[in-house]
């Protein structure tokens, strides 16, 4: 078995990562490709937890702009993340990876309720654990969910898998041709410079709990495995 740098990993997977080129909804072929990448990580012996976003289905801020109460819109977003959790669970189990979906909002007919010690036990048994439903409270993003769950399960790292962006830049590299990429940053750098890595609540929580992040392009095959093995790709935030 290959040597790995990070034993217990929390992967933040955006909803858009499951929608393919459409950018909205669900794409089975994309989910299959993502699942195969995750199986590689699992087969290395890493304990893998996943936090799903919901942006391919719904964003709370979208509803707020349309005149919805923010809390109500956020609850819709939480339900979107549960759909994504079930979708990636199916893709993983189709290729033989045992998984559990755990939700912050109880819906026992669909998934297990989130219980921290039970989640840790699943990881110890080699199951991939998918955290869905956000934190269960409105006004908190899935970035914050990632930082919270990583702290709760004592994850060694948060992997921020990005679509088509290979790290953290001082400007949007898709819009600014000479944007500068950072190889290493501190959490305080991210906060003070206003870099778009994760929201400020998530950044502060990661800093306070000494959880490193690696921001990388998930569209390049094998990158998740490379990060877990300790290869220097993307941007590391510590």
UniProtKB/Swiss-Prot annotation:
Residues 20-25 are annotated as: Involved in allosteric activation by GTP. It catalyses: UMP + ATP = UDP + ADP. Keywords: Allosteric enzyme, ATP-binding, Cytoplasm, Kinase, Nucleotide-binding, Pyrimidine biosynthesis, Transferase. One of its GO terms (biological process) is 'de novo' CTP biosynthetic process. UMP binds at residues 54, 74, 135-142. It is found in: Cytoplasm. Its EC number is 2.7.4.22. GO terms for molecular function: ATP binding; UMP kinase activity. It is an enzyme of class 2 (transferase). The keyword Cytoplasm applies. ATP binds at residues 12-15, 55, 59, 163, 169, 172. Pathway: Pyrimidine metabolism; CTP biosynthesis via de novo pathway; UDP from UMP (UMPK route): step 1/1. One of its GO terms (cellular component) is cytoplasm. It holds the Pfam family AA_kinase. Belongs to the UMP kinase family. Homohexamer. Catalyzes the reversible phosphorylation of UMP to UDP. This is Uridylate kinase. The gene is pyrH.
């Amino acid at each position: 078995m290959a040597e790995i740098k990070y034993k217990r990993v929390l992967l933040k997977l955006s909803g858009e990562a499951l929608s393919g080129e459409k950018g909205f909804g669900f794409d089975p072929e994309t989910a299959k490709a993502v699942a195969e990448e995750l199986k590689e990580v699992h087969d290395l012996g890493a304990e893998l937890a996943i936090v799903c976003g919901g942006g391919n289905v719904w964003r709370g801020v979208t509803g707020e702009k349309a005149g919805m109460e923010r809390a109500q819109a956020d609850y819709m977003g939480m339900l979107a993340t549960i759909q994504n959790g079930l979708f990636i669970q199916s893709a993983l189990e189709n290729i033989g990876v045992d998984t559990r979906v755990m939700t912050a909002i109880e819906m026992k007919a669909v998934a297990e309720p989130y219980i921290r010690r039970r989640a840790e036990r699943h990881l110890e048994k080699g199951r991939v654990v998918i955290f869905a439903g956000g934190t269960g409270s409105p006004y908190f993003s899935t970035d914050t969910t990632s930082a919270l769950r990583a702290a709760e399960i004592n994850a060694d790292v948060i992997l921020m898998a990005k679509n088509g962006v290979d790290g953290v830049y001082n400007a949007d590299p898709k819009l600014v041709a000479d944007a500068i990429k950072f190889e290493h940053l501190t959490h305080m750098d991210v906060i003070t410079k206003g870099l778009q890595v994760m929201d400020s609540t998530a950044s502060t929580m990661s800093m306070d709990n000494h959880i490193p992040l690696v921001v990388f392009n998930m569209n390049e095959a094998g990158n998740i495995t490379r990060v877990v093995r300790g290869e220097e790709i993307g941007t590391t935030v510590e």
